[in-house]
């Protein structure tokens, strides 16, 4: 960094001081506009299924700056998961996929509230989904996806 350039630290709402986060926010506003960034920042997202696609989706949404992210998966990490699961350390084989992915996902953007749910999506009642604005389901059977889709459509959840 050039010597003549000063960087001022700005205190953010969450108490973090990090110019990079502010720079990222300004970039995102320029990228898709203030209204879209406000909607993203307010979004409560559920991603069910923490394999390759689920990992990529959660990473991108957390980096974009959603309000909160819940990752749900009832299965445990396998050696095969280590190939596509960049969020879960390889020494977490045998641990729940959602819980194994939690720490690295939180590190991607400390301003996003990230939680892990080790339950089975198939056991969730309709009221559970009402806690979210966006629900994304990956790696589940078609009948489960259709059931979740029906619940989300009935409750105006994206």
Question: Model-flagged regions — what are they?
Answer:
Residues 1-158:
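Adenine nucleotide-associated cytosolic modules
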């Amino acid at each position: 960094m050039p010597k003549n350039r000063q960087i001022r630290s700005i205190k953010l709402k969450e108490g973090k001081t990090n110019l990079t986060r502010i720079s990222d926010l300004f970039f995102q506003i320029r990228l898709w506009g203030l209204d879209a960034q406000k909607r993203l920042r307010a979004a409560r997202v559920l991603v069910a299924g923490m394999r390759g696609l689920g990992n990529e989706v959660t990473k991108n949404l957390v980096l974009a700056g959603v309000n909160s992210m819940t990752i749900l998966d009832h299965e445990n990490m396998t050696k095969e998961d280590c190939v596509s699961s960049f969020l879960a350390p390889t020494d977490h084989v045998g641990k729940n996929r959602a819980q194994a992915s939690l720490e690295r996902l939180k590190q991607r953007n400390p301003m996003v509230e990230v939680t892990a749910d080790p339950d089975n999506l198939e056991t969730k009642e309709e009221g559970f989904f009402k806690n979210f604005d966006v629900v994304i389901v990956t790696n589940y059977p078609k009948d489960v996806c259709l059931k979740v889709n029906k619940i989300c459509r009935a409750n105006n959840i994206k």
